[in-house]
Amino acid sequence: MIVEVVVMTNIEERINQIIQVLREQVVQDTAVPRNIRRAAEQAIEALQNKEKEPAVRAADAIAILEEISEDPNMPLHTRTIIWEVLGALEQIK
């Protein structure tokens, strides 16, 4: 039981770090097109939905971010951030 709580805490910490990266480096970056910032906000909302298990929240966010990851209007630095976030989300089980 204690191990389970520690694992959940680590997963929640990882999710919070991912939310922080999305918020600071995508949502608040005015050089990023509005549709991409909106998708990042939707991914953040999906990650913050405590009614679902962490793996389901991560899968929801992955689906949203993968859809916009190939947008030709996305700045290269933002695309790199999105790919890094996707990699981190894929590790959440």
Curated annotation (Swiss-Prot):
It comes from the Archaea. Gene3D superfamilies: Ta0600-like. Pfam families: UPF0147. Belongs to the UPF0147 family. This is UPF0147 protein PF0239. It comes from Pyrococcus furiosus (strain ATCC 43587 / DSM 3638 / JCM 8422 / Vc1).
